């Protein structure tokens, strides 16, 4: 009887596959999940003297698994974990054990904060290295003995003071709660790290201020956080965050403290003087002076009307009489995502040429945006300044902690700013002179400088 050729081929393939499988089992039999565990020392004395300070565990797993290494004190069966359910890929591993385990407290001990890592107490231990397969939950373990010799176990470094101020942080360079100061007091020498945990779980390191204490010394250390806006970066999104301080001593003991920080109204402020497609970006015109415009430290005088004649947008040089008003007008846009803070005097305010903003009680304020005018004969930078917008264009916010009211131009909004300077000083060697506008972020930067430069000539009054 003759078998069909196809059936013969199929039978041959099946037999070949069976032989291959059998051969694999003979040549390379299935390996256990935990292939081997070795420990280099049976006794350690973790006192940093360089003699038997640590032991080395070597182990191999044949499949991806969760690995734990725990030390069980024989006196009371208390467990001290070195590793707990840590994910490992198949392969060989070497790990050094210096006696430092997961944090714990002994009876009658207290510590401000949480203990992350601490030296294990001296005594007799049974170690257990256990693995659990990631694919089918198969488990294996191996045990051994370890003696730990040493003196009294010190506490990890403590941060006996840890403060975060203010708890609500508005990183928008408006001069109000723009920075967070973190104060930490270490009770002994330790490496100190402070960081913010963002909403993705990432650590954002916070820089230590260089003061009297050196890094790592016991004592007070200060950390300064501004959200990145100082380097022109966008701060983290608004929300609740955690500030963490970790202290670690030379033998690896560590503790941490945490505090909550709320970020709100954050964002890099961005504004500009709006360029005009036709005509002057900065309108300059002249007007006669009236005594009602006079302003002083005690009161702002009458406000001059905003220039609104279409012919005022020309780019021609200005010729004006001594004692008349040089009137300007321009538009500012907040094109950022956060409001910008501004302060007076209001648009329409008239300055005498020798007056400064401070002469009207309007002192420089960190974080405030103002429009300024400067001329070549000005003795200081942008001596004449105005708020960006009239009160009805701005949003007023009162700080409940001090009852101060602050004014903001909302994101995406524009405001027209205008005002005047009474030109009273003719300097023959600087006549005509140029005058121009700028957008000032006080104590931060002048973002738009030398905008709308125009030649101004003074002539004697008739």
Residue ranges, per PLM feature:
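Terminal connector regions
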Residues: 425-459
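Short, hydrophobic/aromatic beta-strand segments
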Residues: 67-71, 81, 192-196, 338-375, ...
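Asparagine-centered strand-capping/turn motif at beta-strand->loop junctions
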Residues: 331-339
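Short loop/turn motifs at secondary-structure boundaries
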Residues: 26-302, 307-308
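Hydrophobic membrane-insertion alpha-helices, especially the h-region
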Residues: 8-25
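Solvent-exposed, conformationally flexible loop/turn segments
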Residues: 90, 218, 319-325, 409-416
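Enriched for extracellular/lumenal, surface-exposed ectodomains of secreted and cell-surface proteins
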Residues: 130-135, 246-248, 405, 437-445
């Amino acid at each position: 009887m003759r078998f069909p050729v196809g059936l013969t081929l199929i039978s041959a393939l099946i037999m070949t596959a069976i032989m291959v499988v059998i051969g694999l089992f003979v040549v390379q039999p299935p390996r256990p999940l935990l292939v081997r565990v070795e420990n280099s020392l049976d006794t350690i004395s973790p006192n940093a003297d360089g003699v038997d300070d640590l032991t080395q565990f070597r182990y191999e797993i044949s499949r991806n698994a969760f690995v734990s290494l725990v030390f069980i004190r024989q006196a009371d069966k208390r467990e001290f974990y070195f590793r707990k359910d840590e994910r490992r890929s198949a392969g060989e591993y070497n790990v050094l054990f210096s006696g430092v385990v997961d944090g714990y407290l002994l009876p009658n001990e207290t510590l401000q904060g949480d203990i992350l890592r601490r030296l294990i107490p001296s005594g007799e231990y049974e170690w257990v290295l256990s693995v659990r397969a990631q694919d089918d939950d198969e488990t294996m373990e191996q045990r051994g003995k370890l003696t730990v010799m040493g003196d009294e176990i010190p506490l990890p470094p403590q941060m006996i003071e840890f403060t975060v101020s203010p708890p609500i942080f508005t990183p928008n360079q408006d001069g109000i709660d723009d920075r967070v100061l973190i104060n930490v007091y270490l009770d002994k020498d330790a490496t100190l790290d402070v960081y913010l945990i963002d909403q993705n779980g990432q650590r954002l390191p916070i820089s230590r201020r260089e003061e009297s204490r050196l890094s790592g010394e016991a004592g007070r250390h200060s950390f300064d956080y501004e959200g990145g806006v100082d380097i022109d970066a966008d701060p983290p999104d608004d929300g609740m965050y955690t500030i963490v301080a970790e202290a670690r001593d030379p033998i690896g003991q560590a503790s941490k403290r945490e505090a909550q920080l709320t970020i709100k109204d954050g964002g890099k402020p961005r504004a500009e003087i709006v360029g005009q497609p036709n005509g002057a970006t900065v309108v300059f015109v002249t007007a006669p002076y009236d005594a009602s415009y006079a302003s002083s430290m005690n009161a702002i005088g009458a406000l001059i009307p905003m220039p609104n004649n279409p012919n005022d947008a020309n780019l021609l040089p200005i010729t004006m009489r001594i004692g008349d008003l040089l009137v300007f007008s321009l538009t500012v846009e907040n094109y950022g995502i956060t409001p910008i803070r501004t302060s007076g005097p209001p648009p329409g305010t008239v300055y005498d040429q020798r007056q400064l903003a401070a002469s009207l009680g309007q002192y420089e304020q960190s974080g405030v945006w103002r429009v300024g005018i400067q001329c070549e004969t000005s003795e200081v930078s942008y001596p004449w300044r105005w708020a960006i917008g009239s009160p009805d264009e701005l949003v007023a916010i009162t700080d409940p902690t001090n009852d101060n009211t602050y004014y903001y131009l909302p994101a995406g909004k524009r405001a027209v700013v205008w005002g005047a300077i009474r030109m009273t000083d003719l300097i023959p060697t600087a006549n005509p002179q140029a005058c121009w506008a700028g957008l000032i972020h006080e104590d931060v930067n002048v973002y738009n400088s030398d905008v709308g430069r125009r030649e101004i000539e003074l002539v004697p009054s008739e």
